[in-house]
């Protein structure tokens, strides 16, 4: 009875309003609610990320409790059993896995059910009462491992029944996964529906690419190293490629993928976010709003995408998937040129390339510099200088440059200065993107999350092209699985000014 009375008393005092992050306490009871807890995203990404944060000491068992919520009617132990197989295990951490799983409680309910969310709030409040026997705040983090179609109803339920009620302070935050709409209109509609219920500082639009180690390194590389500052502009850089390649197809996700295609799935969000970090001006400080302000300026400086600077492809066999329509016009491959109309980047093509069922798996940024004027060594035919940042697999960065070939003759050869993370940082475990981003959410750091005006500007760039594709005005070119993609894409790169170094392959240093 005492616990029940205290929960009711706590509920009588509401504290939903946003306050400056610098003044919000980050200690006290923490409730992490995984909505869609029985789904693949939660099992494969969210819960493993939470476990890794727990085992590294970022989630303290005396403060945190994790709640799974979904429509599936299962018990606490059923959910724990489903999750266990996805957590890194070995004899050395069996105990940690068991301890972590005991922090998880499951609540079943629909996503528009007042009864379900009332039960969820009761479970959270009981946890908060038990943890807050001494003075402390209560923090509620809702992670949406859900399709966007249910975001509005879930947000209404949270706002009505599950907001932080502690009279000791704290916060309520929501983490929402992409896709954030299919075009400008649907994205704005979704943003408005969520924005009516939560303030912008309470909304964390997650793009897991912003949590990758070398993506997070971009601003440090650009603004903490003196020699990059005078080179990073149109006077020295000829073109920039941002590439995402997969060597497998849709693999059972054909029906889902066909609704979106490679541009919506990869280019409009992941690769565009990388482009912003590559192209933005130096922010006033490291504060999230200063960084995001500069990213928005880049997006607002972009010119409309021209059809003649776009090549689309669809791998042969894509429509063999029974969930894909026979008349599908959805691209599984795209190469396009984006152009920024500002003083730093006028005339420099940003080449975005993404595709499935290609000949390799990698993601990288390739900055190609201009030819050396007055080439007295006649070495430009060997290739241009390039700075390459390998995002995955095997994180690395290297500078491709021309040196004298060892020997008695004055001849040149291409070589590289490189930094392989696997070699340089042996024994250092590079965190998964979801670990970083969930920790950022708990800390109230929105630097690596997408702001509403940033999202709007991104959709303004791509919506006209996407509508032309949806209407069948732009057709994908068939290409063979395991190839480089359509030959027309290589022609587009050449026309944009990219000079390929034939026969040169960077070999990562061995351990």
Swiss-Prot record:
Annotated catalysed reactions: D-glucose 6-phosphate + NADP(+) = 6-phospho-D-glucono-1,5-lactone + NADPH + H(+)
Residues binding D-glucose 6-phosphate, per UniProt: 178, 208-212, 246, 265, 356, 361, 392
GO MF, one annotated term: NADP binding
Keyword check for Transmembrane helix: no
EC annotation from Swiss-Prot or TrEMBL: 1.1.1.49
Species lineage: Eukaryota, Viridiplantae, Streptophyta, Embryophyta, Tracheophyta
Annotated function: Catalyzes the rate-limiting step of the oxidative pentose-phosphate pathway, which represents a route for the dissimilation of carbohydrates besides glycolysis. The main function of this enzyme is to generate NADPH for reductive biosyntheses.
Tissue: Found in tubers, stolons, roots, and flower buds.
Location in or out of the cell: Cytoplasm
Keyword Secreted: no
Protein name listed in UniProt: Glucose-6-phosphate 1-dehydrogenase, cytoplasmic isoform
Enzyme class: oxidoreductase
């Amino acid at each position: 009875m005492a616990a029940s009375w205290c929960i009711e008393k706590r509920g009588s005092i509401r504290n939903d309003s946003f306050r400056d992050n610098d003044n919000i306490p980050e200690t006290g009871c923490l409730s992490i609610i995984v909505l869609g807890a029985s789904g693949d995203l939660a099992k494969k990404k969210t819960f493993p990320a939470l476990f890794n944060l727990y085992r590294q000491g970022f989630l303290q068992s005396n403060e945190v409790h994790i709640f799974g919520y979904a429509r599936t009617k299962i018990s606490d132990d059923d959910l724990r059993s489903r999750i266990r197989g996805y957590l890194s295990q070995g004899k050395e951490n069996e105990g940690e896995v068991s301890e972590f799983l005991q922090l998880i409680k499951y609540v079943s309910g629909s996503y528009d059910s007042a009864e379900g969310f009332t039960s969820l709030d009761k479970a959270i409040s009981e946890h908060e009462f038990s943890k807050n026997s001494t003075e402390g705040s209560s923090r509620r983090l809702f992670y949406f491992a859900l399709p966007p179609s249910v975001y509005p109803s879930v947000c209404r339920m949270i706002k009505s029944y599950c907001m932080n009620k502690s009279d000791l302070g704290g916060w309520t935050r929501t983490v929402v996964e992409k896709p954030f709409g299919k075009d400008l209109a649907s994205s704005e509609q979704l943003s408005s529906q969520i924005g009516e219920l939560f303030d912008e500082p309470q909304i964390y639009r997650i793009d897991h690419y912003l949590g990758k180690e070398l993506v997070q390194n971009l601003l440090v590389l650009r603004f903490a190293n003196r020699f990059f500052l005078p080179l990073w502009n149109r006077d020295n850089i000829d073109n920039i490629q941002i590439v995402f390649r997969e060597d497998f197809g849709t693999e059972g996700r054909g029906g889902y993928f066909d609704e979106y295609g490679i541009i919506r799935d990869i280019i409009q969000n992941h690769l565009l976010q990388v482009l912003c970090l590559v192209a933005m001006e130096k922010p006033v400080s490291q504060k999230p709003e200063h960084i995001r302000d500069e990213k928005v300026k880049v997006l607002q400086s972009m010119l409309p995408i021209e059809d003649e600077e776009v090549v689309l492809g669809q791998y042969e066999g894509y429509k063999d998937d029974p969930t894909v329509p026979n008349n599908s016009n959805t691209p599984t491959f795209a190469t396009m040129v984006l152009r920024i109309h500002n003083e730093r980047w006028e005339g420099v093509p940003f080449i975005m390339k993404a595709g499935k069922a290609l000949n390799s798996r990698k993601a990288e940024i390739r900055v190609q510099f201009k030819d050396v004027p007055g080439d007295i060594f006649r070495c430009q035919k060997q290739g241009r200088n390039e700075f390459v940042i390998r995002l995955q697999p095997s994180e690395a960065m290297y500078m491709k440059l021309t040196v004298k070939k060892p020997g008695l003759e004055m001849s040149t050869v291409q070589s590289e200065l490189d930094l392989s993370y696997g070699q340089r940082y042996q024994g250092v475990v590079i965190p998964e993107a979801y670990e970083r981003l969930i920790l950022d959410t708990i800390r109230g750091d929105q630097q690596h999350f997408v702001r509403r005006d940033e999202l709007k500007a991104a959709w303004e760039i791509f919506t006209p092209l996407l509508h032309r594709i949806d209407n069948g005005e732009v057709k994908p070119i068939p290409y063979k699985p395991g190839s480089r993609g359509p030959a027309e894409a290589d022609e587009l790169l050449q026309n944009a000014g990219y000079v390929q170094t034939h026969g040169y392959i960077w070999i990562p240093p061995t351990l």
